[in-house]
Amino acid sequence: MITFNNLGNLGRLANQMFQYASLKGIARNRGFEFMIPPASAFGTRDLMVKQDGTNIYDIFDLSDNNYGLQVNQVCMERMHTFDKELFNNCPDNVDLLGYYQTYKYFQHIESEIRSDFKFQTDLFETCSDFMKVNFVYRDVISLHVRRGDYVSNPNHPLQTVEYYQRALEMLPNLDVIVFSDDPDWCNAQEIFQPDRFSISESNTVDADLCLMSLCKYHILANSSLSWWGAWLAKSEKIIAPKNWFGGDCVNKSVSDMEFGNWTWL
């Protein structure tokens, strides 16, 4: 039995999705059972998770799992990229710890993960109706602007207006939904004119992620949330910033995050 006892206390929704999917992928590859913490354990030690108020149990049906906490030897993620040694030789009875931000840990069970990450019916129907009413089945671009905690964190550089301009030049003449934790900043930018751009006003991470998954093309921020939006959508075109990390983390590789029709700018 392998576990991830810190699931729900080591990052918010999108990080939890990577951790859950990677735990399941590693367990399946090694032929082990796995266990995840109960919902009551989420946010008990991570203030950001508690403040955010959204976790994987809120928006997905993960009832077909083993729940609980088991004391296991900690197995720490050794690198930011895919760890083939861990994937192929992870021992049983360990507790995974880290972020595991690459689809390569679960690409062999992609259909299972997509099934696990189906949005709950009420949320999906609300978002689907919004798209039908406002875009009448037109192809739409998801554009993500992450600011919030990034404003004061050099390890996660803010993306410039110029980055978004260059990305949009690659996808001309299409409607765009702008998703952001700082909609006031987005509304103040001349680039986001209302004739083409709609600023998401959902004010919730779960609705934004669901709406992202209903878009056809994706312009990412350096954020795992928009990464998941593109993955869930099986995006036909993904544009992502080269400067995913900065500061002390500037040399971290993100090559193992790339999938599908992906372009770095």
Predicted regions and their residues:
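A short, glycine/small-residue-rich beta-strand->loop->alpha-helix junction that serves as a flexible
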Residues: 8-18, 152
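Short, solvent-exposed loop/turn segments at secondary-structure junctions
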Residues: 10-11, 39-44, 100-104, 146-150, ...
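Leloir-type glycosyltransferase catalytic cores
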Residues: 125, 247-265
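Secretory-pathway luminal glycosyltransferase catalytic domains
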Residues: 3, 39-170
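Histidine-anchored nucleotide/phosphate-binding helix
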Residues: 16-28, 164-169
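A short beta-strand-loop structural module common to alpha/beta enzyme folds
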Residues: 30-42
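A structural signal for isolated positions on well-ordered beta-strands in alpha/beta enzyme cores
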Residues: 33-35, 142, 175-177
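Donor-binding and catalytic core of enzymes assembling or modifying cell-surface/extracellular glycoconjugates
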Residues: 13, 171-241, 246-254
